[in-house]
Amino acid sequence: MNLTKQICHKAAHFDAVAFDVFDTLIKRDVAVPTGLFRLMGDDFYAARIRAEREARAAQSGEVTLAEIYARPCLARYDAAAECAAELAACAANKPVLDAVQTLKKQGKKLYYISDMYLPQTQIDAMLRRCGYPCFDGGFVSCTYGVQKRSGRLFKRFLQETGLTAKQLLFIGDSWRADVAGAALAGITAWHLPTPPAPADNDAAFVENRLPQQRSDGESLGFSVLGPLAAAFCQWLHARRAARPEARLYFLARDMYLMRDVYHTLYPQEETGYLQVSRRSLAPAFLAAGDWATVLAALPRQTLTGAQIAEYCGTTCPPELANRQLDLKQPDREALHAFLQQLPRPDTADAVTAYLSAQGIRPGDFLVDIGSGGTTQLLLERLLQFPLHGLQLSADDRLRTRFAPDQTEVFLFDGKPAPRLYWAGQPMLERLLSQDVGATLGYCTEKGGIVRVRTARQPAEPRIAQIQSGVRRFAAAWRDSVLNGQPIPPQRAIAPFLRLVESPTALQLELLGDLTVEDGGTYPLAAPQHTAHYLTHPRQARRDFAEARWKIGFLQRAVPLPLPYGKLYLKLKK
């Protein structure tokens, strides 16, 4: 039974239901209540903590907000600013909101009772903002000078409403103030089950909004990829602010979603979207006889002569079509000799025409998901001027090509990403990318207009749901009290790394059957039934080799409570 149904079931035999407010009806987008003060500045935080301590020491009953702000240390601050921050930081506890709405329709009398220094008008405003229907009454300790924990506020409630203790159910999250305090007044109370306290403000923000997501895919995008996308875009924005004359270009397809998030967070800014790929650029290098750069553009795997020719936008002599060439550990002389025998690609000039039309200038920012900086390398050689790379991650090739002042990296302190990240990187790329086929090349049409050619690719509904969740995170963050607060890189990537190493059954179901492109089309983690592999061990090896999320493959193939992530990483050492 979910929480909403539990509340309605518990309330069925009572005429009236009263609720605690904070952490019951309402949650805040901060890990602890005083975290809101810290968002308002360190000086205010120190003064506000001191003022409340002094106000409580000066009297025995509950204090009011006015009494707190009457302390000399808060003389230069306005209570209205704190009230505005409280209003901005509040979020409905969605299961409780749903229960309150149901109970209202059933004709129950509904009240709230809170130990709080905020005035009742402020609490009413926060409840309205969170979507709660009008309550039949509210009782706040600072109004009456008595608290729940002593039982006296509950007794005052019964006196004011004329209800008997037997008519009322009280629901709250505190055993001491809510359950024990209500019992002192003879009132039945139910302790609201609560999750562990959030680790930080970002976690509180996510937890408060997860119940509002419309599908499992949206929830995954919101909680796992939303913080990463927002944090990366914050970092991009800071770099652009340092050099406002430089334009920001996001690379297709990998940075499609990141560009959407950037525009959500910073709608006033213009950016570019470069529809380029290593494959789309390769014809220009083949035409120029730049064999070393053609090799850099080619995928690092074994391909046939026909596959290499197609990749470079040309045809292969029949006698070379079936020749196998290892591009991961290439024989450079043999490869150069092969490339010399390929005809000049017809589309080579269209490559430079497309780039010329984009208005790229020296020093402009190039935003990429990143590994070895290959696309930046290719573009710089074609454009014949330097760009400034901004990558999400990097491998150990990057610093052999670009210095830190030429290409910056967001994750892992700019160092090569760890094995666990690469174990899930193909999945990350798929989830962030525009859900269209790869950029294959360019065609020059009448009037010199260059048309981009892309591969056919059917839309994947799960990708759309996940990306919708990421966009919803960005919009919610922009409109929240946390907007402007940086999300640290290590905090931003942590949910994704947890998913890669220890996915839940639901995450495996959502993601495992997705496919990725990697010189071919491969499943992320789609094993056949375990029983099939017991009689076909070679098939098991082939399927495992093809899986691009091997930890997920193992967990789906043999669903036992084993640390597959740790086992896989040990095997990779």
What do the PLM-derived regions correspond to, one by one?
Residues 5-50:
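Active-site neighborhood of HAD-like aspartate-dependent phosphohydrolases
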Residues 42-51, 73-85, 131-139, 167, ...:
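Short, surface-exposed acidic
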Residues 111-113, 117-168:
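Substrate-recognition "cap/lid" segment bordering the active-site pocket of phosphatases
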Residues 155, 159-161, 168-171, 179-180, ...:
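Long, low-complexity, Lys/Arg-enriched
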Residues 62-67, 71-112:
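Short, acidic loop-to-helix structural element flanking the phosphoryl-transfer center
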Residues 2, 89, 124-126, 131, ...:
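Hydrophobic transmembrane helix bundles of membrane-integrated enzymes that assemble
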Residues 6, 95-102, 125-126, 181, ...:
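A short acidic, amphipathic alpha-helical/loop segment
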Residues 31-59, 292-309:
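Conserved phosphoryl-transfer catalytic core
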